[in-house]
């Protein structure tokens, strides 16, 4: 079983990594093509394109200028440890052991507007480029056109390498939109996490993002390979709802937050 999650806007390059193992991103030639285009934008153009403050636009213009494809532990960090946000709070990889990282490296992928697909231990230099950014490029009008079917092909290769055909979607719609389902040679299992609010179960963004990270953590820590075991997920008060679920749509409910 292979999982996909979204990246995060918030990055942490200050905290020392808890593992010294690392790998190199597999698709840097594509990332470099995007970087070369981003370098042509002024901070004002970046601000308008990405709807960023002047300060953040300036920061990312500097990031694009200093980005170069020779990644080392001195100028980059493992992607799973560099991303910070609700999903990664739930995943909490900071307390992983080496065996956890090894399993994650085989069974987890992070989708990225710049890097396409990242493995957990892939070194990553800091950036800001959300998948939904309408960055016109040589391949089309936006990043979905830029990546085309490549991300699906790379996920197929990862699945083939582990001899499996199940893809667990823990990514947002924005990011999973870059995955062409028809090109996948896999059964896709979607997930929903709902919390009780005002008498109804609803998807609350903050909690749902964190729950997606907790589900990824559960799969990694339990070394889960059979999707049937996903129904046993019960972290922080969530429980499987057979009534609201379908064969490839797993719904988890929670009656009260526990965090």
Swiss-Prot record:
TM ranges: none
GO CC terms of this entry: cytosol
Pfam families membership: H2O2_YaaD
Highest taxon listed in the record's lineage: Bacteria
Record GO biological process: response to hydroperoxide
Family the entry assigns: Belongs to the UPF0246 family.
PANTHER family: PEROXIDE STRESS RESISTANCE PROTEIN YAAA, PEROXIDE STRESS RESPONSE PROTEIN YAAA
Protein name: UPF0246 protein PA3539
